[in-house]
Amino acid sequence: MQDSALERTRIAAVNAARAARASYRAGTVQPTAGIAPGMTQANMIALPRDWAWDFLLYAQRNPKACPVLDVIEAGAQQTVLAQGADIRTDIPLYRVWRDGKLAEEVADATPLWTEHPDLVTFLIGCSFTFETPLQEAGIEVRHIADGSNVPMYRTNRQCRPAGRLHGEMVVSMRPIPAHRVADAVSISGRFPSVHGSPVHVGDPAALGIADLARPDFGDAVRIEPGEIPVFWACGVTPQAAVMASGVPFAVTHAPGHMFITDVPDSTYHV
């Protein structure tokens, strides 16, 4: 009886993920935090083939910020993480980068794969994946509660360079009640493939963040009395590398607008 209930829950979650992707394919644009709870979400970056090795090495050298979940070969658009999905259309919002600068945001990236048929795509673990376990433990995830995007910040922590790529770590922030910080660290730490435990707790100035009310990406969130800002490595870090390194061309997800997979978050729980 219990097994059948769990299977029904799993099927419902997969169906929710597929429905979300279909909605994005049809043109819906929204941040994905809280969508299809229990399913793994992923950051995305696609680069021309001659930059792929640099990025793979960059990710290998910086696994906290860039944990690779899948690599889609040059010219392909499908991933083993989501049956029938198309990486060009099934993310709600994409960013297009030219010579290290943000050129535009689009809801359908299909023409970009026509323009650059040799794109190699990397799917990177996302901390949205462990937000459901945080909520199940009674820890409010503020940006979900308030219906906003997660705040993200560039930091003074430099990633280890690789080939032509270099840049700083980007972090996401969630305010956590002081008495629950240890729980948040423990819960997220069981998900190392999606950034794992925090990289910093407390004073944002230690990361070079001057003002929490002015995130570099996403939306500012309220911090209540008795709460402490907790910072996790973020999969927007590759976008910082694109900017710092002047990559000629790249396509990424827009911050907070993830690729929702068919993989349960429990798959990455250790």
Curated annotation (Swiss-Prot):
Organism: Cupriavidus necator (strain ATCC 17699 / DSM 428 / KCTC 22496 / NCIMB 10442 / H16 / Stanier 337) (Ralstonia eutropha)
Keyword vocabulary terms for this entry: Lyase
Disulfide bonds: none
Documented EC number(s): 4.2.1.-
Protein name per the record: Putative hydro-lyase H16_B1759
Enzyme class: lyase
Record keyword Lyase present: yes
Entry similarity comment: Belongs to the D-glutamate cyclase family.
Record keyword ATP-binding present: no
Stored InterPro entries: D-Glu_cyclase, Putative_hydro-lyase, UPF0317
Top-rank taxon, per record: Bacteria
GO molecular function, one term: lyase activity
